[in-house]
Protein backbone atom coordinates (compact mmCIF):
# COMPACT_ATOMS: atom_id res chain seq x y z
CA UNK A 1 0.00 0.00 0.00
CA UNK A 2 1.06 3.59 -0.57
CA UNK A 3 1.62 5.70 2.53
CA UNK A 4 -1.57 7.76 2.12
CA UNK A 5 -3.60 4.63 1.56
CA UNK A 6 -2.04 3.03 4.64
CA UNK A 7 -2.76 6.07 6.80
CA UNK A 8 -6.37 6.15 5.61
CA UNK A 9 -6.70 2.42 6.29
CA UNK A 10 -5.27 2.79 9.80
CA UNK A 11 -8.07 5.21 10.74
CA UNK A 12 -10.52 2.32 10.35
CA UNK A 13 -8.69 0.04 12.81
CA UNK A 14 -9.97 -0.64 16.32
CA UNK A 15 -8.91 -3.47 18.58
CA UNK A 16 -11.70 -5.86 19.50
CA UNK A 17 -12.08 -7.08 23.08
CA UNK A 18 -10.63 -10.46 22.09
CA UNK A 19 -7.66 -8.81 20.39
CA UNK A 20 -7.02 -6.73 23.51
CA UNK A 21 -6.93 -9.85 25.67
CA UNK A 22 -4.51 -11.49 23.23
CA UNK A 23 -2.26 -8.42 23.06
CA UNK A 24 -1.96 -8.31 26.85
CA UNK A 25 -1.20 -12.04 26.96
CA UNK A 26 1.57 -11.98 24.37
CA UNK A 27 3.08 -8.83 25.87
CA UNK A 28 3.40 -10.67 29.18
CA UNK A 29 5.35 -13.23 27.15
CA UNK A 30 7.86 -12.72 24.35
CA UNK A 31 6.14 -10.10 22.17
CA UNK A 32 7.20 -6.49 22.43
CA UNK A 33 6.17 -3.00 21.36
CA UNK A 34 8.22 -0.53 19.34
CA UNK A 35 7.75 3.19 18.81
CA UNK A 36 9.50 5.46 16.33
CA UNK A 37 7.80 8.73 17.25
CA UNK A 38 8.36 9.19 20.96
CA UNK A 39 5.42 7.06 22.06
CA UNK A 40 2.61 8.61 20.01
CA UNK A 41 2.06 5.26 18.33
CA UNK A 42 3.44 1.73 18.65
CA UNK A 43 3.69 -1.45 16.63
CA UNK A 44 3.44 -4.94 18.10
CA UNK A 45 6.25 -7.32 17.12
CA UNK A 46 5.86 -11.09 17.38
CA UNK A 47 8.70 -13.56 16.91
CA UNK A 48 8.94 -17.24 17.88
CA UNK A 49 11.16 -20.18 17.03
CA UNK A 50 10.16 -22.14 13.95
CA UNK A 51 8.81 -25.04 16.02
CA UNK A 52 6.07 -22.63 17.10
CA UNK A 53 5.26 -21.57 13.53
CA UNK A 54 1.60 -22.61 13.83
CA UNK A 55 1.23 -20.43 16.91
CA UNK A 56 2.71 -17.44 15.06
CA UNK A 57 0.35 -18.04 12.13
CA UNK A 58 -2.55 -18.22 14.57
CA UNK A 59 -1.59 -14.87 16.10
CA UNK A 60 -1.31 -13.42 12.61
CA UNK A 61 -4.80 -14.70 11.84
CA UNK A 62 -6.21 -13.15 15.02
CA UNK A 63 -4.58 -9.78 14.28
CA UNK A 64 -4.69 -9.97 10.50
CA UNK A 65 -6.28 -6.60 9.77
CA UNK A 66 -3.47 -4.98 11.77
CA UNK A 67 -0.70 -6.65 9.75
CA UNK A 68 0.30 -5.64 6.21
CA UNK A 69 2.80 -8.44 5.58
CA UNK A 70 2.33 -12.14 6.49
CA UNK A 71 4.82 -13.81 8.87
CA UNK A 72 8.32 -14.18 7.46
CA UNK A 73 11.29 -16.32 8.37
CA UNK A 74 14.24 -14.56 9.96
CA UNK A 75 17.43 -15.51 11.72
CA UNK A 76 17.63 -14.98 15.45
CA UNK A 77 19.99 -15.74 18.30
CA UNK A 78 19.12 -17.33 21.65
CA UNK A 79 21.87 -17.66 24.26
CA UNK A 80 24.46 -17.41 21.51
CA UNK A 81 22.81 -20.03 19.31
CA UNK A 82 21.59 -19.06 15.82
CA UNK A 83 17.90 -19.93 15.36
CA UNK A 84 15.38 -19.87 12.53
CA UNK A 85 12.35 -17.87 13.63
CA UNK A 86 9.00 -16.76 12.24
CA UNK A 87 7.98 -13.16 12.81
CA UNK A 88 5.52 -10.42 11.92
CA UNK A 89 4.66 -6.94 13.07
CA UNK A 90 1.53 -4.82 13.12
CA UNK A 91 1.17 -1.36 11.70
CA UNK A 92 2.19 1.45 14.02
CA UNK A 93 -1.00 2.80 15.59
CA UNK A 94 -2.14 5.22 18.28
CA UNK A 95 -4.44 2.59 19.78
CA UNK A 96 -1.40 0.57 20.81
CA UNK A 97 0.08 3.59 22.61
CA UNK A 98 -1.94 2.82 25.73
CA UNK A 99 -0.18 -0.53 25.93
CA UNK A 100 3.15 1.19 25.46
CA UNK A 101 2.50 3.36 28.51
CA UNK A 102 1.27 0.35 30.50
CA UNK A 103 4.05 -2.08 29.65
CA UNK A 104 7.15 0.12 29.34
CA UNK A 105 9.18 2.26 31.74
CA UNK A 106 12.34 3.90 30.42
CA UNK A 107 12.29 1.51 27.45
CA UNK A 108 12.18 -1.56 29.72
CA UNK A 109 9.19 -3.89 29.61
CA UNK A 110 7.36 -4.13 32.93
CA UNK A 111 4.18 -5.69 34.26
CA UNK A 112 1.43 -3.05 34.60
CA UNK A 113 0.33 -2.26 38.15
CA UNK A 114 -3.27 -2.86 37.09
CA UNK A 115 -2.57 -6.20 35.39
CA UNK A 116 -4.90 -8.06 37.75
CA UNK A 117 -7.79 -5.90 36.56
CA UNK A 118 -7.14 -6.38 32.83
CA UNK A 119 -5.99 -10.02 32.72
CA UNK A 120 -8.59 -12.62 31.70
CA UNK A 121 -8.50 -16.39 31.25
CA UNK A 122 -7.77 -15.82 27.55
CA UNK A 123 -4.90 -13.50 28.53
CA UNK A 124 -3.52 -16.22 30.80
CA UNK A 125 -3.75 -18.78 27.97
CA UNK A 126 -1.83 -16.62 25.51
CA UNK A 127 0.81 -15.78 28.09
CA UNK A 128 1.22 -19.50 28.72
CA UNK A 129 1.34 -20.45 25.03
CA UNK A 130 3.86 -17.68 24.50
CA UNK A 131 6.19 -18.32 27.40
CA UNK A 132 5.12 -21.26 29.56
CA UNK A 133 5.59 -25.01 29.84
CA UNK A 134 5.00 -28.05 32.00
CA UNK A 135 7.71 -28.43 34.65
CA UNK A 136 8.53 -31.98 33.57
CA UNK A 137 6.99 -35.23 32.37
CA UNK A 138 6.86 -36.41 35.97
CA UNK A 139 5.00 -33.43 37.42
CA UNK A 140 1.75 -31.54 37.06
CA UNK A 141 3.52 -28.29 37.89
CA UNK A 142 3.48 -25.44 35.37
CA UNK A 143 6.31 -22.99 34.67
CA UNK A 144 6.16 -19.42 33.38
CA UNK A 145 9.51 -18.13 32.13
CA UNK A 146 9.60 -14.73 33.78
CA UNK A 147 13.37 -14.37 34.11
CA UNK A 148 13.38 -11.00 32.32
CA UNK A 149 11.15 -9.41 34.97
CA UNK A 150 12.18 -7.98 38.33
CA UNK A 151 10.76 -9.07 41.67
CA UNK A 152 7.96 -6.48 41.79
CA UNK A 153 6.78 -7.49 38.31
CA UNK A 154 6.81 -11.16 39.30
CA UNK A 155 4.84 -10.39 42.45
CA UNK A 156 2.14 -8.76 40.32
CA UNK A 157 2.00 -11.80 38.05
CA UNK A 158 1.70 -14.14 41.02
CA UNK A 159 -1.17 -11.95 42.26
CA UNK A 160 -2.87 -12.48 38.88
CA UNK A 161 -2.52 -16.25 39.15
CA UNK A 162 -3.72 -16.25 42.75
CA UNK A 163 -6.67 -14.13 41.64
CA UNK A 164 -7.68 -17.06 39.42
CA UNK A 165 -7.49 -19.34 42.47
CA UNK A 166 -4.14 -20.88 41.52
CA UNK A 167 -1.33 -21.67 43.94
CA UNK A 168 1.85 -20.06 42.61
CA UNK A 169 5.25 -18.94 43.85
CA UNK A 170 8.72 -17.83 42.76
CA UNK A 171 11.23 -20.40 41.48
CA UNK A 172 14.77 -19.06 41.45
CA UNK A 173 17.02 -20.07 38.56
CA UNK A 174 20.58 -19.13 37.59
CA UNK A 175 19.26 -16.70 34.95
CA UNK A 176 16.47 -15.17 37.02
CA UNK A 177 13.12 -16.02 38.57
CA UNK A 178 10.46 -18.26 37.07
CA UNK A 179 6.90 -18.55 38.32
CA UNK A 180 5.82 -22.03 39.37
CA UNK A 181 2.14 -23.04 39.48
CA UNK A 182 1.62 -25.96 41.83
CA UNK A 183 0.50 -29.30 40.44
CA UNK A 184 -2.36 -29.14 42.95
CA UNK A 185 -3.76 -26.30 40.79
CA UNK A 186 -3.26 -28.07 37.47
CA UNK A 187 -6.86 -29.15 36.91
CA UNK A 188 -8.12 -25.63 37.56
CA UNK A 189 -5.37 -24.13 35.40
CA UNK A 190 -6.19 -26.49 32.53
CA UNK A 191 -9.88 -25.61 32.75
CA UNK A 192 -9.07 -21.89 32.64
CA UNK A 193 -6.74 -21.90 29.65
CA UNK A 194 -7.98 -25.00 27.81
CA UNK A 195 -10.73 -23.28 25.77
CA UNK A 196 -8.18 -20.86 24.26
CA UNK A 197 -5.14 -23.09 23.67
CA UNK A 198 -4.73 -23.86 19.97
CA UNK A 199 -4.30 -27.42 18.72
CA UNK A 200 -0.59 -26.97 17.98
CA UNK A 201 -0.05 -26.03 21.64
CA UNK A 202 -2.21 -28.74 23.23
CA UNK A 203 0.94 -30.58 24.30
CA UNK A 204 1.40 -27.82 26.88
CA UNK A 205 -1.89 -28.76 28.57
CA UNK A 206 -2.02 -32.57 28.39
CA UNK A 207 -5.29 -34.09 29.56
CA UNK A 208 -3.53 -37.18 30.93
CA UNK A 209 -1.86 -35.05 33.58
CA UNK A 210 -5.18 -34.60 35.33
CA UNK A 211 -5.43 -38.18 36.56
CA UNK A 212 -2.14 -39.96 36.00
CA UNK A 213 0.51 -37.83 37.69
CA UNK A 214 1.13 -36.77 41.30
CA UNK A 215 0.34 -33.20 42.31
CA UNK A 216 3.90 -31.99 42.84
Q: Where in this protein do the model-derived segments appear?
A:
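Internal intein/HINT superfamily modules and their associated LAGLIDADG
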Residues: 1-216
Amino acid sequence: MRSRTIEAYKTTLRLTDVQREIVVGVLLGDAHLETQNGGRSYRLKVEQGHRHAEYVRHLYSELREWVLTPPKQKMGKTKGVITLNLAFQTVSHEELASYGSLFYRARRKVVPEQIREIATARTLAYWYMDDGSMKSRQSKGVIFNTQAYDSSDIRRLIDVLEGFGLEAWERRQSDGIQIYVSGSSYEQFAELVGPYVIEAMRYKVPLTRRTQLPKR
